[in-house]
Swiss-Prot record:
Its EC number is 3.1.4.-. It holds the Pfam family Metallophos_2. It comes from Methanocaldococcus jannaschii (strain ATCC 43067 / DSM 2661 / JAL-1 / JCM 10045 / NBRC 100440). Its cofactor is a divalent metal cation. A divalent metal cation 2 binds at residues 70, 92, 115, 144. This is Probable metallophosphoesterase MJ0623. One of its GO terms (molecular function) is hydrolase activity.
């Protein structure tokens, strides 16, 4: 949704969900495209000292930011909130009061957000797909592995933005989503 192309509303059901339950947030887009920044495993300040400036540059034009957990410090969420609305879930390293799961509904697309630490072996795509089916979502976004992927796993799109600070592959990364009638995902490498 860029430059007055439309308006959007947000409705949240469920109040404060039990940590095992999913919060449910609904977005309505009228006449435009919604841009979403996706980030995970920032690990400030336990493993990294700062978020690269390139993350803020890439997210400067988004309507919403999703953080898939292992935030580890509330300050990063506050910094991201200066750019856009933020939806975040709790990771295995977080002590913040965040839900374990979130379901976003953007027009007719249901997006599940989890950290992914409940999936073993770590990042197993089949188990992620089954979890997405259980949540009733079209797209499941997770973190935890610090390794990015975009995988159209039969009937569920599986996404992981990797980590912009402590990757487990050579690539530091985030992700951007564009949602209109369909969802398109793009992996964004983060340069130092």
């Amino acid at each position: 949704m860029r430059d007055g192309e439309g308006i959007w509303g947000r409705g949240r059901t469920g109040g404060h969900a039990h940590p095992k339950e999913a919060m449910h947030t609904t977005f309505f887009i009228l006449g435009g495209t919604m841009l979403i920044g996706v980030i995970s495993d920032t690990h400030l300040y336990d493993r990294a000292f700062e978020l690269p400036k390139a993350v803020f540059d890439e997210f400067s034009n988004v309507d919403l930011i999703i953080h898939c957990g292992d935030v580890t410090d509330k300050e990063i969420l506050d910094s991201l909130k200066d750019l856009a609305k933020v939806v975040a879930v709790k990771g295995n390293m977080d002590y913040l009061n965040l839900p374990r799961k979130e379901i976003l509904e953007i027009n007719d697309i249901k997006i599940g957000v989890i950290h992914g630490d409940v999936v073993y072996p770590r990042g197993d795509r089949l188990k992620l797909r089954l979890l997405g089916k259980e949540m009733g979502v079209d797209v499941l976004i997770s973190g935890h592995t610090h390794t990015p992927f975009i995988d159209d796993c039969r009937d569920i799109l599986l996404l992981n933005p990797g980590s912009p600070t402590v990757p487990r592959c050579p690539l530091k990364s985030i992700m951007k989503l564009s949602v209109e009638d369909k969802l398109e995902a793009k992996l964004i490498p983060i340069e130092e």
